[in-house]
Amino acid sequence: MSRLPETKLDILLARHAALEAQLLGPVNSEHYVKITRELAELNPLVDAVKAYRQVRDEIGDIDSLIADPDSDPELRAMAQAEHAALEEHEAELAQQIRIALLPKDAMDDRNVMLEVRAGTGGDEASLFAGDLFRMYEKFAALQGWSVEVISASEGAAGGFKEIIAEVKGRGAFAKLKFESGVHRVQRVPDTETQGRIHTSAATVAVMPEVEEVDVEIKQDDLKIDTMRAQGAGGQHVNKTESAIRITHLPTGIVVMMQDSRSQHKNRASAMNILRSRIYDAEQQRLDAARSAERKEKVGSGDRSERIRTYNFPQGRVTDHRINLTLYKLPQVIAGEALGELVDALTTDYQAAQLAAQGD
């Protein structure tokens, strides 16, 4: 394992001390918020660095005691027993520091544009898409985030053919970004009289909410159509052309929005989704090139990749990217144990990043 960058750690400690000193002086409310936010980000790393250096000093003292031929034999034996435990703790802290120093995804703190679509499996796929969306809703609530549905198309038997929502909360993209891909369910539908297990699927897309400065969209690249909103069966549900369809000509990405009676609101929502999809498409292209080079299992962003299976008869959830199986299906679907999968995927991704640094 590579040595820690001591000079960089010294700079971080100095920055932390300088920020704390600024708080003791006169500071306006806007600057105060910036300082406290940066301190909150630095605190875990600074605590780990201080603990690491303290343990390292203790190991040095013990080494001196063990090497001293005049030291008490009983004390030397006790020191040798403590030495192994301290070295293990030192290694744990060093790894914690390495992970904290990994490059941060600039989008990790962004809100999320979440899209869940029914795949193969007919009505059962729509029901499963509904289950997945509610799982994310409950998980978001546990994180203290909010979820706002932007557009929804309900399935004939319930659930959703497609649902698009905005998940708002600090770190939403960091925790949800590995959920993109094909989710498969194996269960006996309520309408199945023979007790046969059916397999169906739904596709999840998790995209960071991007701003105009993040993605440049030229007006000439857009084809905008307006129309009257339609309900189930295709009938018009209002007399004004409030529905809007925006096509991004260079990429062929199309966004249709009709949930609001206001064309202005539909257009704003459609542009938000379009920006996220354009950004996401470019990231998928870059990620595919990177993962092809590094053979990464997690983070490839491939929407066609089957990432997880929910087997109801066996009560298990298996994430195929990291070969992790949890026999906690009810808790996962309830959003309570989804965090275990999220944490495992994050740890695996961080391990891949550390390995890449060592290449």
Swiss-Prot record:
Alphabetical list of PANTHER family matching this protein: LD18447P
Gene responsible for this protein: prfA
SUPFAM superfamilies tied to this protein: Release factor
Highest taxon listed in the record's lineage: Bacteria
Record's function text: Peptide chain release factor 1 directs the termination of translation in response to the peptide chain termination codons UAG and UAA.
Compartment(s): Cytoplasm
Protein name per the record: Peptide chain release factor 1
GO molecular function: translation release factor activity, codon specific
Origin species: Rhodopseudomonas palustris (strain BisA53)
